[in-house]
From Swiss-Prot:
Presence of the UniProt keyword RNA-binding in the record: no
Keywords assigned by UniProt, alphabetized: Nucleotide-binding
Pfam families given in the database record: DUF520 (PF04461)
Similarity comment: Belongs to the YajQ family.
Native organism: Acidovorax sp. (strain JS42)
Protein name (record): Nucleotide-binding protein Ajs_2750
Role of this protein: Nucleotide-binding protein.
Keyword field contains Nucleotide-binding: yes
Gene3D superfamilies assigned: 3.30.70.860, YajQ-like, domain 2
Annotated SUPFAM superfamilies: YajQ-like
GO MF term (any one): nucleotide binding
Any one annotated GO CC term: cytosol
């Protein structure tokens, strides 16, 4: 039976490159000279540092631009609230989403069930596998998921015939 997987995974090689390019630009820009503005990547979290709120926002804008240039969807980013870390310095943690959470997976499963297509959707850890008898139904399901679940940067892989 034909099937495909619906996943939500960022290309971490490109994320790492974008963070490195952001750090390089922060080091060379005149308006960041003599400030504590910085960016670092640990595991699946990007940490932004700055002296003021507007500076933190500028660092985040640079990061988003670099990610966009590297074809990484910025919907993968989940920015937390800025925190004070001593003196006037601020820190902001930006989590990189990886995988579909159970609530979104159930939403995708319900969407496919309600579509009246002859398909089955199974939640497998952090992805949703959709199986069906006809390839056309699978393609219709892909279009339906793209249209209705716009807040997640979903991709489809492991397409089997």
């Amino acid at each position: 039976m034909p099937s495909f997987d619906t996943v939500c995974e960022a290309n971490f090689v490109e994320v790492k490159n974008a963070v490195e390019n952001t750090a390089k630009e922060i080091g060379t820009r005149f308006d960041f000279k003599g400030t504590s503005a910085a960016v670092e990547l640990k595991d699946k979290e990007i940490t932004l540092y700055g002296d003021a709120d507007f500076q933190l926002q500028q660092v985040e804008d640079i990061l988003r631009n670099k990610l966009t240039k590297r074809n990484v969807d910025v919907r993968f980013l989940d920015a937390q609230k800025p925190q004070k870390i001593g003196g006037d310095k601020l820190k902001q943690v930006v989590k990189v989403k990886n995988g579909i959470d159970s609530e979104q997976a159930k939403k995708i499963q319900r969407l496919i069930k309600d579509s009246k297509l002859k398909l089955q959707a199974a939640i497998q850890e952090d992805k949703v596998r959709v199986t069906g008898a006809k390839r056309d139904d699978l393609q219709a399901a892909m279009a339906l998921i793209r249209k209705d679940i716009a807040d997640l940067p979903l991709t489809f892989d492991n397409f089997r015939d």
